[in-house]
């Protein structure tokens, strides 16, 4: 027995039903219990799986999520990407990774690219949000989640850098016998400014 790719016509023939009935079966339309069982049996016996392209055309879903990161050589970011990848895989999605090398313009370009290539959603681990970022985000037709920063109007997952720095300084000063120093930089727009304020 040679391997051959099944199609809807062959399933209909083997199940002794019409092509339209098989189509309704795959599109969750009405099919009698008897015919539904015949089709299910053929699918099970042949190991048929609809092609990803056919499913995408039917459902308008790609099962792909674009993930935009500022740099790949960061332990914290690689840890986030690993966790995102694991969760997406368990949910049946593919991860498309874009590394921007801390280039704000690249982040905006990837937002546009992912939008044009019909991903089902975007996860953005951004550095700073410029007016160009905000325009690109507003133009998106897919859900967006921002990680690491708070951006009004979007679903965000972030830590309170201001409070974390304030509490760290308070705890250090409480037990300090000598003047303490806590190093932060304002140059890190994503977290540094809030930590400096704290």
What kind of region is each of these model predictions?
Residues 36, 78-82, 134, 166, ...:
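Short, surface-exposed alpha-helical segments at coil->helix boundaries
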Residues 96-104:
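Short beta->alpha junction loops
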Residues 1-6, 45, 86-91, 139-146, ...:
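Bacterial carbohydrate/catabolite-sensing allosteric modules
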């Amino acid at each position: 027995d040679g391997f051959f790719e099944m199609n809807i016509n062959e399933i209909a023939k083997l199940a002794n039903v019409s092509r339209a009935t098989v189509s309704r079966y795959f599109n969750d339309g009405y099919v009698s219990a008897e015919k539904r069982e015949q089709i299910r049996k053929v699918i099970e016996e042949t190991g048929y799986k609809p092609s990803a392209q056919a499913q995408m055309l039917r459902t308008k879903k790609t099962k792909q999520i674009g993930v935009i990161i500022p740099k790949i050589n960061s332990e914290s970011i690689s840890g986030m990407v690993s966790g995102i990848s694991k969760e997406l895989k368990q949910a049946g999605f593919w991860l498309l990774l874009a590394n921007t090398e801390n280039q704000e313009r690249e982040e905006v370009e990837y937002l546009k690219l992912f939008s044009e290539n019909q991903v089902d959603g975007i996860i953005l681990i951004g550095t700073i949000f410029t007016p160009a970022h905000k325009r690109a985000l507003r133009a998106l037709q897919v859900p967006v989640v921002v990680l690491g920063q708070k951006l009004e109007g979007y679903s965000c997952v972030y830590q309170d850098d201001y409070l974390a720095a304030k509490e760290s300084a308070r705890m250090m000063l409480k037990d300090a016998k000598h003047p303490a120093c806590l190093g932060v930089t304002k140059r890190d727009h994503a977290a540094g400014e809030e930590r400096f304020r704290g």
